[in-house]
């Protein structure tokens, strides 16, 4: 049986596919801190690095598919875009290519520049994804907070022999740094929105505040 779509139905169908792709790949990227791979050497760190590379590749493919399905072919150029490109250009111009001290970080920085424009594209295509990405980011903070509390009370193993509190990271430094980044987002969401997001923001903020002391 052949299924035929009207013009409006086809447009909605393609829009749903674009939104689904952006949601899945964006959630994968935001969940990077939770990833680890014990099969790799130093899997806590390298697992996150490889996952980030995979998520970036999938987001790039998703952008191509989104454009092919009829998405906008361009995004408005803004001042932050120019400042970011200027900073990237200065970094490349001043990088010592003969010594080449940090090739991995240079690649990572280039991926962050690409990520900026990929997010700009997806959020222009589907502005509703802002709320979804906020929810996923706060959810990762909540998971990290619960993970840390389990480690403090002996219900989960720490990833470092000298520290009891590491979350999904190797030591408490990046763990607390990540919670410090997510906490203001949770507080802003709790104060800015109402109903579901309001209460979820307070739950995440409360859980994060309990852990570091």
Report each predicted region and the residues it spans:
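Positions in alpha-helical segments
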Residues: 117, 163, 207-209
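Transmembrane signal-anchor hairpin modules in multi-pass inner-membrane enzymes, especially those
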Residues: 1-93, 99-107, 111-139, 188-204
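Membrane-interface interhelical loops and short amphipathic "cap" helices
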Residues: 38-44, 95-100, 150-168
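Hydrophobic alpha-helical transmembrane segments
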Residues: 88-95, 129-158, 174, 209-213
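Transmembrane helix irregularities
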Residues: 34-35, 169, 210-213
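Membrane-interface segments at transmembrane-helix junctions in multi-pass inner-membrane proteins
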Residues: 156-189
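Generic hydrophobic alpha-helical membrane-span motif
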Residues: 100, 108, 150, 177-179
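Hydrophobic faces of alpha-helical transmembrane segments in multi-pass integral membrane proteins
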Residues: 111, 139-142, 179, 183
């Amino acid at each position: 049986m052949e299924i035929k779509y009207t013009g409006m139905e086809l447009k909605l169908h393609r829009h749903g596919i674009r939104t689904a792709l952006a949601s899945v790949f964006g959630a994968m990227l935001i969940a990077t801190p939770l990833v680890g791979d014990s099969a790799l050497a130093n899997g806590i760190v390298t697992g996150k690095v490889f996952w980030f590379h995979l998520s970036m590749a999938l987001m790039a493919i998703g952008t191509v598919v989104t454009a092919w399905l009829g998405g906008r072919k361009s995004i408005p150029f803004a001042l932050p875009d120019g400042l970011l490109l200027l900073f990237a250009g200065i970094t490349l111009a001043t990088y010592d290519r003969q010594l080449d001290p940090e090739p991995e970080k240079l690649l990572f920085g280039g991926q962050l520049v690409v990520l900026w424009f990929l997010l700009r594209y997806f959020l222009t295509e589907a502005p509703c994804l802002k709320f979804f990405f906020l929810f996923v980011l706060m959810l990762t903070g909540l998971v990290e907070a619960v993970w840390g509390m389990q480690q403090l009370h002996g219900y989960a193993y720490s990833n470092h022999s000298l520290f009891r509190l590491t979350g999904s990271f190797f030591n408490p430094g990046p763990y607390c740094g990540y919670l410090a980044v997510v906490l203001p987002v949770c507080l802003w969401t709790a104060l800015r929105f109402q109903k579901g997001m309001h209460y979820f923001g307070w739950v995440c903020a409360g859980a994060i505040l309990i852990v570091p002391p």
